[in-house]
Amino acid sequence: MQTPTHPPSEEDRRETARLVKAVEVVYEDDDLIAFNKPTGLLIAPDRWDRDRLNLMRVIHERWSPEYFNAHRLDRDTSGLVLCAKTRATLTALCRLFEKGAIVKRYRALVRGAPPERAGLVRARVVPDRFHPGRMCVGRPGKRAETRYEVVKAWRGFTMLRCEPLTGRTHQIRVHLAHVGCPILGDAFYGDGRGLMLSEIKRRYRHGADAERPLIGHLALHAESLTFEHPADGRAMEITTPPPRAFDLAVRYLDRFAG
């Protein structure tokens, strides 16, 4: 059953325009094209709301209806999405993803710290029967492995580089929460809070207006893809930097939580 639609508000229209503008090409050749997806944008149409804005609709309207995404990101995860320009390339890319031949690296800003500077989380992931749409660590579940390393650490917060070795739903988010360092802004597997300046700055003075977070969205970014090009086998590494909110958060953490 499709959710009833209502005329979009002015705020909704502004947000839609912002998301559309934020989609950008990171790499392109004759066979494939990579986009930088902003946080808050679905990859594909919502099954309950077909009119909801999604990345593939933006791509089909702004670039070509013949492009196909070879993998997915969560709505609130920003970063690289690799698309094929032909069915043959799509088949080849999907095969590479299924074989684990495409190395995916993510940047995550978390609350707390993992147990080690670098490590491997091995924990089976299963749908959470108490919270539909969420996952949790449990058995029998599916095998899931995530490699991580500390990029930078502050009092109470850590920047991690993560590499999922399997491709389970919400895998990085579940695994980081499991080892005690949920991602900032994660309402499913953490407390949903972003980074507030008042948390890290001593004698912070609250103004008349409500404080806005330095980073208020899910602080998880798909920053690189490494693979062999399906057309000629040449080594490929496509990268894109995190959103500006990451840089802002790091700047204030360096200043007040170093």
Named regions from a protein language model:
Residues 1-145, 152-154, 176, 241-257:
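RNA pseudouridine synthases
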